[in-house]
Amino acid sequence: MTRYKATISYDGYAFAGFQRQPHARSVQEEIEKTLTRLNKGQTITVHGAGRTDSGVHALGQVIHFDLPYQMDEEKLRFALDTQSPEDIDVISIELVAADFHCRYAKHSKTYEFIVDRGRPKNPMRRHYATHFPYPLDVERMQIAIKKLEGTHDFTGFTASGTSVEDKVRTITEASLIVDETGQFLTFTFSGNGFLYKQIRNMVGTLLKIGNNRMPVEQIDLILEKKDRQLAGPTAAPNGLYLKEIRYEE
């Protein structure tokens, strides 16, 4: 068997998430169906580096799969790209070692979260930016977001029901910028891994801080007490993008 690593992007609006699930459309299943057709009906299993939720987008998701033959990478990329649904793009494909696993190989991820604070909102971006039409103090949020950098126990920002026991993660970059129109905010988070709904919970908390409904020091309190009830609401999924996954050499 020959193992391939692919970088893909997708519009998450019409998907129930990346991971295959019964009675719902998923990115994994759509790519597997296309690869199975290319493999003359023989089933191909796709593995993903990240499991994005329903409505979450990806600019640089990474997958891997095995084929029983070797094929030119660009020809394979073109075939998979053109025969996959319109809301999935295959950016690149490369041959990798047989023991490479996109999820378990050491890597870091970068996510972006886009907020539309326009009044009214931009209707063309309604599936691609989370609307928050309330006053926001950007400087307060920029101070607060820096408190998330470093190695912390992020239990207070994790959704209930997660089976992960070790909730210590390292965030190497946490930043917030505003576009030139002042309407769109982009939150960026890079790190060695993120917990279930962690980014959406962090953004929901930062928006509350920006709206003066929580103090800037609330971030310190949440990290110290490890209490989800102290954090803000979970931000909607439509503003979240898996931007990039970087593997160590």
From Swiss-Prot:
Catalytic reactions of this protein: uridine(38/39/40) in tRNA = pseudouridine(38/39/40) in tRNA
InterPro entries: PsdUridine_synth_cat_dom_sf, PsdUridine_synth_TruA, PsdUridine_synth_TruA_a/b_dom, PsdUridine_synth_TruA_C, TruA/RsuA/RluB/E/F_N
Record bears the keyword tRNA processing: yes
GO terms of molecular function: RNA binding; tRNA pseudouridine(38-40) synthase activity
CDD domains: PseudoU_synth_EcTruA
Active site: 53 (nucleophile)
Keywords: Isomerase, tRNA processing
Any one biological process term the GO annotation gives: tRNA pseudouridine synthesis
Class in the EC hierarchy, top level: isomerase
Binding-site positions, substrate: 111
EC number(s) reported in the record: 5.4.99.12
UniProt-listed Pfam families: PseudoU_synth_1 (PF01416)
Family (UniProt): Belongs to the tRNA pseudouridine synthase TruA family.
Described purpose of this protein according to its UniProt entry: Formation of pseudouridine at positions 38, 39 and 40 in the anticodon stem and loop of transfer RNAs.
Complex and partners: Homodimer.
Protein name: tRNA pseudouridine synthase A
Organism: Streptococcus pneumoniae (strain Taiwan19F-14)
